[in-house]
Amino acid sequence: MSGNSLGPNADVLEAQARVCTGPHQTRPLGVKDTDPVQPETVLEIILKSAKRELSIDQMVSDAQMGAFFAAMTIRKHFPPDTRWSQSEIAAFDKYAPDLTEFMPPEIEFLRYPDTAYCSSTPEENIVVGALKRILKREHLTYGETLKVCKAILTNRVKDALKAATLIGQRMNLESYDEVLG
């Protein structure tokens, strides 16, 4: 079930470097006007990619979108310093209608994990079940993680969901030792 083989988009990759980390290392987007990547720009790139308005080398891959939107959803539950910035809130509010219209169902699920999502395979159902917990910052047990990894290694799970699971589980397990370096 591999999606597109596009990307990664460099600007979205820069945004991911800032937001796809744990609760102590995340750097919200758009805190300053001089930040290298602004949340509006990232969402514009993602939407242009979804509409196929970018060149192939500038498009955002399904996996990249999955990781980004999972990270943003998880960050809603982070401590205040690493939770969403006012610029992120404003950008998501501004583009909410377009995101709803142009994002595939798996991305909408990552944005709103309490909504219904219809898995297309048993393996994807395993991953979606785990993501419902991961996106709420809950930890998977060793056995649950093993089961999810086996499902991800098949070619029967959408790339966005694979990336969301890996990034999300990683973000939830940031340790204090990592923060110290």
Regions found by a protein language model. Name each.
Residues 1-181:
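Acidic, glycine/proline-rich low-complexity segments that act as flexible tails and inter-domain linkers
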